[in-house]
From Swiss-Prot:
Keywords (A to Z) from UniProt: Magnesium, Metal-binding, Thiamine biosynthesis, Transferase
Binding site for Mg(2+): D72, D91
Gene name of the record: thiE
Family: Belongs to the thiamine-phosphate synthase family.
Name of this chain's protein: Thiamine-phosphate synthase
Naturally occurring in which organism (per UniProt): Acidothermus cellulolyticus (strain ATCC 43068 / DSM 8971 / 11B)
Length: 212
């Protein structure tokens, strides 16, 4: 699984698409277009409802050979048998999360500063990390942007550790992120809110592949 994560370039965070009512079709479209990792990110879900939705995500991931990620909760990741658990700075320590999910689950960590990147790189328990937000984003209201300088630092410091740039990334500013040294990105609205999500995902995937 860690090898699959290392090969991943395009990581999508998306909600349950309750408003659109198209979750299975949406997942098939974007995973078929080149999304490598997909994470359900929707605050306030009861555990039972989150697991029900994750079943839909898992089925789509199996069809397309993609990785399923769970946000924040090691217990949900364990119950859903996800491939990936992503933790924030204020979530469970990585070592405790590992004791819950086991050795086969890939664990990632959010970082927002040079110091946090340094800590992630020096911790062998962190399988990958995310760097950002590159720009202010409504997904994380009130969080100041880390900016591209932290992305540039990660590009120099990460070595062989996989990492993703995140936060406000879209097709218009993707080249700036690539020029800063990122070769993997996490995307939210630029795919989920696109007029044609599959077309947007395909363009992200193609441009990331060209930069690899």
């Amino acid at each position: 699984m860690k090898a699959s994560l290392a090969d991943a370039r395009l990581y999508l965070c998306v909600d349950s698409r309750r408003r659109q009512g198209d979750l299975p079709a949406f997942l098939d479209a974007v995973l078929g277009a080149g999304v490598d990792v997909v994470q359900l990110r929707e605050k306030g879900l009861e555990a039972k409802e989150e697991l029900r939705l994750l079943d839909v995500f898992a089925e789509a991931c199996r069809r397309h050979g993609a990785l399923l990620a769970v946000n924040d909760r090691a217990d949900i990741a364990y119950a859903a048998r996800s491939d990936v658990l992503h933790l924030g700075q204020d979530d469970l320590p990585v070592g405790i999360a590992r004791s819950i999910v086991g050795d086969d689950v890939v664990i990632g960590l959010s970082t927002h500063s040079v110091e946090q990147v340094q800590a992630a790189v020096s911790d062998p328990a962190v399988d990958y990390f995310c760097v950002g937000p590159c720009w202010p984003t409504p997904t994380k209201p009130g969080r100041p942007a880390a900016g591209l300088d932290v992305v540039r630092y990660a590009a120099q410091a990460a070595g062989d550790r996989p990492w993703f740039a995140i936060g406000g990334i879209n097709l218009q500013n993707l080249d700036e992120v690539l020029e800063a040294g990122a070769r993997r990105v996490v995307v939210v609205r630029a795919i989920a809110d696109a007029p044609d999500p599959a077309e947007a995902a395909a363009e992200f995937a193609a441009r990331l592949a060209a930069a690899a």
